[in-house]
Amino acid sequence: YNRELISRHVSGRLKVAPEHTCSRVLDIMRKPPFSLFHEFKKIFDSVNRTEGLNQQLIPYFISSHPGCHEEDMAQLAVETKNLNFHLEQVQDFTPTPMTVATEIYYSGYHPYTGEKIFTAVRPEEKLAQRKYFFWYDRNYRDDILRSLNRINRRDLAASLFPAYRQSAGTRHPSVASQKAKTGRNKKR
């Protein structure tokens, strides 16, 4: 089925909706684990190679879904970067009637388990998550690095920005080179 779909029924771009990489968030969404997307991408890439096709797989992701923390979005950024995606098809969670996610969004609790579930509802919380979609945009890099430091996930900085050095006291290249150019780093 996959070979038939990919080789004969895709006109250049196949849009799919894994929606997230975090198992906890995917469970709330009632979606399969992200590992299935990995498997599908391998099949997609293999069919493209063997059939001599040059098609794109376009994944759709969502931020600020109930249960999603900023750290989950940082992990999503690393995961999608490792898959060579520069995300375009993204959206912030929007409550829709009659869904478990909307019930959680408004109540703060999972309706079936009674478990308290974090949800980003304030604009600054939503923006803090959304920016990770655009890790490849230089305009977001400094803010992402500050956020990774704040959430104590400096380990992810080197995965997102290979030139970033994690050693104590070392700033990422854009800041260090800027200070060197302006002379602001010199002792007086």
Model-predicted regions and their roles:
Residues 98-188:
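Radical SAM enzyme core and accessory elements
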